[in-house]
Amino acid sequence: VSEWGHNSAKTVHLMTEAERRVYADRAVYLGDPDFFKVPIAQLTNDLYVKERMSNFNPSKATPSMEVREGILLAAESEQTTHLSIVDQQGNAVSVTTTLNDSYGSRVVVAGSGFLLNNEMDDFTSKVGSPNMFGLVQGPQNAIAPGKRMLSSMTPTIFLENGSAALMLGTPGGSTIFTSIYQV
């Protein structure tokens, strides 16, 4: 921008296109921070900004119908942890554990000091209604005695000739599948 000069046609065009995208994000991601968690870190992330400007054309305006809010980058989960360990004898473990939401169920086990999760949210409580992460699931995932909820956790160990060759897993809730798929 500095080489284009202040208020040059190129600079004004770039600023206008950036402002249009910011305004589209404003309508969806901004609000009173006392009532709404504003995703400041995600909105100001360099990768997010680069993605927002990926359809920028320096020679013409982006059609207004194409200027929508951006898709926020998945934030690193504060509630889900994955670890993979191999010892000297080749014993391997791949573990993913989660609270699901901040502070899980908000219930601490007396005398133990750890929180219980709220994985019940991963069941379908009402068909057609989203859970806390916006996922809508069908009746096949309805709550039932002894039933396990649908989960995206995929701690994985690949074996080669009977020995652990690759172990992987990741936090990320509903984005776990796409992260694992890329490996």
Model-derived segments and spans:
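Alpha-helical support elements that line or immediately flank enzyme active sites
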Residues: T170-V183
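Cysteine/selenocysteine-centered motifs that mediate thiol-based redox chemistry or coordinate metal-sulfur cofactors
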Residues: M120-L166
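Structural recognition of the beta-strand scaffold that forms the well-ordered cores
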Residues: S84-I85, V93-V95, L115-N117, T156-L159, ...
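Internal maturation/activation junctions in enzymes
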Residues: S2-L99, R106-S112, E119, K126-V136
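Extended C-terminal subregions enriched in glycine
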Residues: Q89, K126, K147, I180-Y181
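Extracytoplasmic/secreted cell-surface and envelope-processing proteins
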Residues: G104-S105, S125-K126, I176-T178
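A short acidic/small-residue loop/turn micro-motif
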Residues: N100-S102, G172-G173
